[in-house]
UniProtKB/Swiss-Prot annotation:
Enzyme class: translocase
Record text on subunit structure and interactions: NDH-1 is composed of 14 different subunits. Subunits NuoA, H, J, K, L, M, N constitute the membrane sector of the complex.
Gene Ontology CC: plasma membrane
GO biological process: ATP synthesis coupled electron transport
Similarity remark: Belongs to the complex I subunit 2 family.
Domain of life: Bacteria
Organism expressing this protein natively: Sorangium cellulosum (strain So ce56) (Polyangium cellulosum (strain So ce56))
Protein's name in the database: NADH-quinone oxidoreductase subunit N 2
Amino acid sequence: MEPRTLDNVASLAYFAPELVLIAAALLLVVWDLASPARLKLAGLVILSLAALACSGGLGAYFLATDAAPRALFHGLLAFDRFSNLFRVIFALVTGAIVLFLVPPRAPGIEPELRRDSGELFTLILVLSLGMNLMAASRHLLLIYLSLELVSVISFVLAGFKINDAKSSEAALKYVIFGGVASGIMLYGMSWIFGITASMRLDECAARIAALTAQQGKVPEVVFVGTAFMLAGFGYKISAAPFHMWTPDVYEGAPTPVTAFLSVGPKAAGFAVLIRFFSDALGAGSAPPGVATPWPVLFGCLAMATMTVGNLSALEQENVKRMLAYSSIAHAGYMLLGFSVFSGAGVAAIAFYIVTYCFMNLGAFMVVMAVAEESGGDETFAAFRGLGRRAPLVAAAMAVFLVSLTGLPPTAGFIGKFYLFSALLAAGGAWSWVIAVVGVLNSVISLFYYARLLRTMYLDRSDRTEPTPVRPLLGGTACALAIPTVLLGVYWGPVYDFVARSVSMLR
């Protein structure tokens, strides 16, 4: 059933979560200019958290009431369970990042936080707005504009430490790679528009289906245009070979920003990728019996991304850089769901995104806690003996590392189980090849995750005194470890909920 199309005025009620973020961003600017200096930072944090709570709460309300799908603003945006699910995810992730920046100290970014606090929190809220738009876009032009909104703000956040050479280098590399990927993606969109004469994804799907039925195969123009568009999507999710910016940007950016980039924009990239391929190139874009090239294309992309990420992570000495390559590998795991191009595959991707947010945010939070107490040291040496110096934080990190590896009883194991199950359920030799490569990559990842575990618990440190960890930072890390374990032993309701949220996609 096609969603009901609403005009601009009627759409505003369903656009309320984004309107809250827009109003809050404007209010933050006013507060930054007019508030007393001693109240400024606390007010910015409170206003940001309140706005995110309202935005995420509205998304949760729409999910709970199972509101009927709508096409907002004459078909530009989708209002459905999928977009509302990601509204909640983005609000939670952004709220966690705001908590990372709570006074009295924000690791790696304290001087900039005190000097440019208004700009920082405003940018974070607008970035959350852009991610919401990415997940809901059903029009090629809005996909491009929302992706660029997220990208431009990410550039600024990566270079927020203006007096730090690494941060400036990270921002410059991010801009260069982002600009090239953006141009290539826009070029691919022009091919899709040229062959379909439309920018709405549903109309593109109908036109592509007609051409595919007429020719008996997917038109070459559609394949080439989609391949160009994948450059832009691949850049956002750090898929090989568009991943080269990721290690330098993650290492050079302030750690709270790195934590955000590793989960927020990446999840948004997968959301818009799911939306585009489901609505424009899904089941309705080709008649029965006509083979499409997308499973093979995504299978190759997944294998390359997993392998590059895991092999590169093996030789890293900086934990933050290691986690950057780890995030590349996890993008490869999530791409496994696209290689089968089925409802089960999409549900597995969405569930893996939920679990990945918990374990990756938690891992970066522990890195921040360690760097905060070691003078900014983010290498393996700073983690020596952490199991004795800060046992709770080390235990939380152990949970995150086990989950990132994909071992039971953690959420990462269940996430990978559903991904591989969807892959093998598709059948065929190609699915088995991809599955074997995926399992081998999981084994490779065990080496560098286990290396950090060994460093924390078996290596001795010159420091024997307990490591003081900021209560909010350590407490939040331990709190994130709870759902990471809980979803490894009792995942059914969450998976069923996520699967229902993506079931309306083609």
